[in-house]
């Protein structure tokens, strides 16, 4: 006989939803009808996660907590470059987190920001620049160790994948948007490099990206990324909007997104991991996700004490800006 708990612990969120609908509609029939319909839709359109054994091969490839170099280790080398990938491998990282974006002519490249201003000697929006134009820029220009990394170029997705595989690094693909273009580009590299199925994971803040990736290829390991209050506040905790009403609206949206991420979207997408901002992770939090068969990966863990806590106490892998020393986080 089917049990709620066997379906990933959905009894809690659907019971809560039913109670809310009962209070709002005052109609048991309508509340039950809506809740039941939503559940059937969820079951119909959700994806099964990849087998846990293969997911663990990606998330803990050495059968222990993994340290993942954020943007290749943005404190130790220019972020999202081949030099950063090589440096991360040299410094003992188990893997690298890399940001996927696109040029004006549709070439998939590594870049975190929507503009090239912060990391290069150029200016302008990435979506307005062709690959030929961005290839002339120096991605090490504004890095603190710029003199140690001459002649760096903004790499293509394919170049980065080949470099990671050459160093036996697990890849965390952080997809910023462009669900259709991103999944198409990723599918091509998975087909060219089948080894990626066992040593990479596709991650995004945007559930539609992960859902589209699972639609495109259900064998790809995936993860949702989440930071509470991300819609209403910046990474350093500042409100995004000056208008009280607009800020309040986005706070409400944050509450809805947070509930959906923790109760519905992980199941809909069939993810294997949940990448959470470190300040909101506790032993109980890790335990609750583990009960659902999902691994928690923390970001961004940048001090020796924090790393020791994750390694020895929580047993959770983490993403860090530096493999060598304490540093302030990059948002």
UniProtKB/Swiss-Prot annotation:
Binding residues for Mg(2+): 97, 99, 174
rRNA processing in keyword set: no
Residue ranges of every copy of the GP-PDE domain listed in the record: 65-331
InterPro entries: GP_PDE_dom, PLC-like_Pdiesterase_TIM-brl
Cytoplasmic topological domain: 1-2, 276-331
Main subcellular location: membrane
Documented activity regulation: Inhibited by EDTA, calcium chloride, and zinc chloride. Enhanced by magnesium chloride. Glycerophosphodiester phosphodiesterase activity can be modulated by G-protein signaling pathways.
Record's keyword terms, sorted: Cell membrane, Cytoplasmic vesicle, Glycoprotein, Hydrolase, Lipid metabolism, Magnesium, Membrane, Metal-binding, Transmembrane, Transmembrane helix
Transmembrane regions listed in the UniProt entry: 3-23, 255-275
Catalytic activity: sn-glycero-3-phospho-1D-myo-inositol + H2O = myo-inositol + sn-glycerol 3-phosphate + H(+); 1-O-(1Z-octadecenyl)-sn-glycero-3-phospho-(N-5Z,8Z,11Z,14Z-eicosatetraenoyl)-ethanolamine + H2O = 1-O-(1Z-octadecenyl)-sn-glycero-3-phosphate + N-(5Z,8Z,11Z,14Z-eicosatetraenoyl)-ethanolamine + H(+); 1-O-(1Z-octadecenyl)-sn-glycero-3-phospho-(N-9Z-octadecenoyl)-ethanolamine + H2O = 1-O-(1Z-octadecenyl)-sn-glycero-3-phosphate + N-(9Z-octadecenoyl) ethanolamine + H(+); 1-O-(1Z-octadecenyl)-sn-glycero-3-phospho-N-hexadecanoyl-ethanolamine + H2O = 1-O-(1Z-octadecenyl)-sn-glycero-3-phosphate + N-hexadecanoylethanolamine + H(+)
GO MF, any single term: metal ion binding
Modified how: N-glycosylated.
Top-level enzyme category: hydrolase
Pfam families referenced in this protein's UniProt entry, alphabetically: GDPD
CDD domains, sorted: GDPD_GDE1
Sugar-modified residues: 168, 198
Cofactor list: Mg(2+)
Residue spans, topological domain Lumenal: 24-254
Annotated EC: 3.1.4.44, 3.1.4.-
Membrane disposition: Multi-pass membrane protein
Annotated localization: Cell membrane; Cytoplasmic vesicle membrane
Function according to Swiss-Prot or TrEMBL: Hydrolyzes the phosphodiester bond of glycerophosphodiesters such as glycerophosphoinositol (GroPIns) and glycerophosphoethanolamine (GroPEth), to yield a glycerol phosphate and an alcohol. Hydrolyzes glycerophospho-N-acylethanolamines to N-acylethanolamines in the brain and participates in bioactive N-acylethanolamine biosynthesis such as anandamide (an endocannabinoid), N-palmitoylethanolamine (an anti-inflammatory), and N-oleoylethanolamine (an anorexic).
Family according to the record: Belongs to the glycerophosphoryl diester phosphodiesterase family.
Name of the featured protein: Glycerophosphodiester phosphodiesterase 1
């Amino acid at each position: 006989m089917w049990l709620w708990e066997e379906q990933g612990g959905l009894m809690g969120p659907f019971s809560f939803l039913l109670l809310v609908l009962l209070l709002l509609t005052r109609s048991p029939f309508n509340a039950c009808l809506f809740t039941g319909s939503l559940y059937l839709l969820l079951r119909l359109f959700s994806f099964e996660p990849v087998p846990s054994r293969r997911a663990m091969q990606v998330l803990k490839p050495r059968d222990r907590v993994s340290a993942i170099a954020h943007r290749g280790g943005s404190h130790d080398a220019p972020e999202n470059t081949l030099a950063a990938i090589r440096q991360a491998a040299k410094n003992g990282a188990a893997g690298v987190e890399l940001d996927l974006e696109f040029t004006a002519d549709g070439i998939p490249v590594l870049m975190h920001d929507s503009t090239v201003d912060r990391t290069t000697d150029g200016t302008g929006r990435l979506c307005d620049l062709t690959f030929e134009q961005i290839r002339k820029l120096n991605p090490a220009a504004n890095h603190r160790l710029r003199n140690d990394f001459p002649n760096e170029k903004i790499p293509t997705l394919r170049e980065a994948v080949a470099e990671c595989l050459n160093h036996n690094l697990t890849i965390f693909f952080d997809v910023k948007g462009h669900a259709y273009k991103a999944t198409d580009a990723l599918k091509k590299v998975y087909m060219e490099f089948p080894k990626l199925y066992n040593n990479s994971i596709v991650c995004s803040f945007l559930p539609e990206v992960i859902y589209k990736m699972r639609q495109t290829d259900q064998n790809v390991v995936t993860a949702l990324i989440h930071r509470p209050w991300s819609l209403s506040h910046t990474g350093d905790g500042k409100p995004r909007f000056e208008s009280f009403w607009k800020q309040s609206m986005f706070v409400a949206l944050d509450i809805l997104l947070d509930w959906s991420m923790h109760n519905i979207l992980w199941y809909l997408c069939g993810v294997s991991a949940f990448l959470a901002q470190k300040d909101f992770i506790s032993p109980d939090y890790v335990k609750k996700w583990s009960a659902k068969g999902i691994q928690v990966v923390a970001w961004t863990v940048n001090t020796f004490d924090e790393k020791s806590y994750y390694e020895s106490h929580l047993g959770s892998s983490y993403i860090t800006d530096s493999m060598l020393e304490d540093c302030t986080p990059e948002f």
